[in-house]
Structures are given as structure tokens and as C-alpha cells.
């Protein structure tokens, strides 16, 4: 029986590894549903990394298993293996291939981040519209005669803020909705500057460009919505995050930065409405925000005692009536 050439076995193994790797990379089911425009970009990058990782795993583990079986010590063998040392072509190969893979993934990841708006210097002006400015930035915008040229140059050279900014299709445009997000131990507070609404949940319309101005009141927190593939630390210098939700629904908001003993309980939710439902929610909550009813300590105490409003009115009338009999 004619022996199959080693090249045929190598080619067959390469085809099998390639097919398995591509199948695993596109059918893994490891990620939650996609609910934002940024999610497909992140998922595509993850699929590529998983495909490459699967191929490397199969090649390395397959080679180990093959050599363990084929070159195992057999019965009656007492000698040692040949003292082989060094193989320049092989060493160059297994150094060059990982280096090329790392370079490719690094360049591609930067491209993905830029398409999401992360490293686009043109977004600095849009960030400055809503984000708090430092003293140096204020000096740069309103220079006085006493400001030296060196100080002005330093202010003008202030680097752009980084983070998840505006994607290229909305670059230079104002967001449809701005929300101030404050993280504190152990809650998220969402404030809508245009309406004065303050909420413990994030409400946004589907299909609209949303900008979050992130801040932390105590320690560092990290705003994470898995379905949006959106994770941004609330730290100085990275104040804004922009995204666009694509599916109506309710999704968890998680703090992904260890922030204290109850870090695991720092959760809330983002509710994505249709534009009509969002306007209804905003009108209802704006009325409450413009005329808040804050009960006094006395009112809360009376309510806890079960005293009716009529009885309170009678007591107050007697107390303010000079003709009433004093006990």
C-alpha cells in the first residue's frame, strides 16, 4: 500500500483547521444580542480574534497530541532522543507569524475604535459643547492681554478628549439627546439638561444619536451596557460617550470597575423607547421635574401616624383662632 505523502496530510490538516476555525468564529454564540450601531463593529473584531485563536489552538494542541502519540517511548526502548538544538527557519517562522498577527489586530482595533469615534480629533469641538472645561481651556477661549504667548500656545495645544465620540457619519453634528451621567457608590444618576429630568434609569429614543457626559462623584466607575458593546470609564479627560441604539427594549447598565464593597449591586437599566413613547415619557417626567412635590419632615411624620388631612386642618384652625378656648 502506497503511503500518503506528508504534504497531502499537511494540506488536509490545514483545510480542516481553517474550516473549523471559521465555523467557530461565526457560530460561537458567546455575545449577547446587538442593540446599537457600534455593536456589529465590536462583534466583527471579536469574531476575527476568536477565529485566529481557534486556529492557533488547534495547530498547537494538534502538534502536541501528534508528537505525544507518534514519538512516545515504546516497549524495549532504553535510549534517549537525539540532542537537537536550534532551528533558525522554524524559530523565524514562529516569531514572525505571531508578530504579524499582533500587528494586524492592533491596526484593525484602532480602525474600529476610530469608526466608533474614539480617536477622532475633529470631535473635540463637539465634546467641548457639553463637557466641563478646565481653566486652561477657558483661558484659550477668552485670552486677555495679560496672558503670555506661551500660555496661549499651551492652551491651544490641549489634546482632544478621547473615548467613544461621534462616529464619522455624525461627525461635527450636535447629538440628538444629551444626558449627564453621574456614578456614585452605588448608583447611577441620569440628568437631562434640556428638560431638568433626573432619573435613576436611562431613557433614550431608538435610532437617535445620544451623548452621555460621564462623571464620578467619589471613586472611578465604569459605565457598561453589554448589548450596546459600550463600556466607558468615568474618569477625568474622557467625559463623553456617543452611541445610537437600534432596538427597542430594556437592557442592563452595570458598573464594570471595582468601586467598593457593594460594587456588584451597582446596577440599573437603560430603556430604549420608540420616539413617540420617549416623548410621552419626557412630557410626563418634565411636569414632575418642573413642579416637584417634596414633603416636609412634619408631613412625613403626620402621614406615618395616620392622621388625616381634615384633622390637621381643624387643629390648625383652632390654633390660629384667637377666640378659641385655650386649654
Curated annotation (Swiss-Prot):
GO biological process: ATP synthesis coupled electron transport
Catalytic activity: 4 Fe(II)-[cytochrome c] + O2 + 8 H(+)(in) = 4 Fe(III)-[cytochrome c] + 2 H2O + 4 H(+)(out)
Binding site for Cu cation: 221, 255, 259, 263
Bilayer-crossing regions: 56-78, 96-114
Signal peptide range in chain numbering: 1-23
Enzyme class: translocase
Record GO terms (molecular function): copper ion binding; cytochrome-c oxidase activity
Cofactor requirement: Cu cation
Keywords linked to the UniProt accession: Cell membrane, Copper, Electron transport, Membrane, Metal-binding, Respiratory chain, Signal, Translocase, Transmembrane, Transmembrane helix, Transport
EC number from the UniProt entry: 7.1.1.9
One of the record's GO cellular component terms: plasma membrane
Pfam families registered for this protein in UniProt: COX2 (PF00116), COX2_TM (PF02790)
Membrane topology label: Multi-pass membrane protein
Compartment(s): Cell membrane
Coiled-coil residues: none
Co-factor note (free text): Binds a copper A center.
Record-stated family: Belongs to the cytochrome c oxidase subunit 2 family.
Function: Subunits I and II form the functional core of the enzyme complex. Electrons originating in cytochrome c are transferred via heme a and Cu(A) to the binuclear center formed by heme a3 and Cu(B).
Designated name of the protein: Cytochrome c oxidase subunit 2
Species of origin: Thermostichus vulcanus (Synechococcus vulcanus)
Gene name as annotated: ctaC
